[in-house]
């Protein structure tokens, strides 16, 4: 499995690789980090699976764009290669990185991402605002996004939940509901087992 560690900012890519390898050892999967590759796109073309870790989405997108990985990964996904991404890794699977929660600490070439799905993901979705916080809630920020991007669906994916897309069918896995946003549609929630075909 090819691992993309480029969302790491305060620790090294090698440290991230080791951390991820330790977890995947439990299920017998060998991890190869793309930062060691002389030809990153070739590594993607030869990958049996692709895993993109969390961290800072802007740092991740910038490095992926510099190495031409967005299109290479999309091509592999279309061929049936499994893709796993958490946090920033889920953001880059979307058409854009515009619904990340991260600070723009570096400037990528654009906000465009892999586009493996047609909707936007907001990972770590929270309902509550911290006590004493006078800024926008997560929901308010997403409502701003759909105001500017009225054709796009956004899903608020809560902690401990994931989306599994296989053979043209998608399911929510986890014990918490997922919040759904779209311009002109009253915000609603879906649970594990609900039909998500409207997002595809």
Residue ranges and their predicted role:
Residues 46, 66-80:
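Catalytic-core regions built around general acid/base machinery
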Residues 3, 11-15, 99, 103-200:
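C-terminal and late-domain segments of enzyme folds
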């Amino acid at each position: 499995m090819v691992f993309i560690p480029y969302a790491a900012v305060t620790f090294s890519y090698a440290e991230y690789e080791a951390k991820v390898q330790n977890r995947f050892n439990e299920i017998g999967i060998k991890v190869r980090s793309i930062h060691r590759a002389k030809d990153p796109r070739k590594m993607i073309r030869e990958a049996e699976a692709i895993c993109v870790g969390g961290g800072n989405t802007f740092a991740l997108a910038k490095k992926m764009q510099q190495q031409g990985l967005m299109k290479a990964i999309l091509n592999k996904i279309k061929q049936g290669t499994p893709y796993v991404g958490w946090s920033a890794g889920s953001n880059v699977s979307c058409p854009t990185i515009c619904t990340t929660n991260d600070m723009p600490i570096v400037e990528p070439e654009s906000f465009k991402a892999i586009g493996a799905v047609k909707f936007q993901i907001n990972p770590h979705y929270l309902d509550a605002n911290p006590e004493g916080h006078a800024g926008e809630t997560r929901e308010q920020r997403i409502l701003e996004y759909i105001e500017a991007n009225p054709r796009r669906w956004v899903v608020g994916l809560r902690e401990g939940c994931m989306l599994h897309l296989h053979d043209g069918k998608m399911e929510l896995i986890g014990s918490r509901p997922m919040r759904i946003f779209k311009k002109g549609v009253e915000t609603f929630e879906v649970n594990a087992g609900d039909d998500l075909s409207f997002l595809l």
